[in-house]
């Protein structure tokens, strides 16, 4: 399903965001860059379109895009997307991705939230609240099964 955005809640409450379709990723980045007065070259947009998900504040995006995928995925490089009441950048990403998908694919964007519901419930609840404030009330919750 290309009309899908995945919000991952990782250990420590870090939040990562990804959109399946590369063309929607580019349009989402363009909308975010307008909102936050950032600029990205065509090469940076292309590199961003290859990233399945990311988890940094918008002011660190340029630096993240420049890294190789190996360096990008090293422990501690991505600190998570801010999603608290003081700096709720996740709300901006959700809105931008919804608008981008509507523009590019003329369809509604579907959402999935990934995480360990038992351990990450407070953070997952914050993500659900962020979606519901934008009238996104239908989403998939994907939780991992752990062996005993």
Q: What are these language model-derived features?
A:
Residues 1-148:
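Long, low-hydrophobicity, acidic/polar, solvent-exposed interaction domains
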């Amino acid at each position: 399903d290309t009309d899908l955005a995945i919000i991952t809640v990782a250990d420590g409450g870090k939040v990562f965001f990804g959109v399946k379709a590369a063309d929607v990723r580019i349009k989402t980045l363009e909308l975010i860059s307008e909102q936050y007065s950032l600029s990205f070259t065509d090469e940076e947009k292309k590199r961003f379109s290859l990233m399945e998900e990311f988890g940094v504040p918008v002011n660190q995006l340029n630096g993240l895009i420049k890294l190789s995928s190996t360096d990008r995925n090293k422990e501690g490089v991505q600190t998570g997307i801010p999603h608290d009441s003081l700096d709720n950048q996740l709300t901006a990403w959700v809105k931008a991705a919804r608008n981008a998908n509507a523009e590019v694919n003329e369809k509604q964007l579907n959402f999935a939230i990934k995480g360990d519901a038992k351990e990450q419930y407070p953070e997952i609840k914050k993500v659900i609240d962020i979606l519901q404030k934008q009238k996104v009330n239908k989403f998939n919750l994907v939780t991992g099964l752990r062996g005993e």
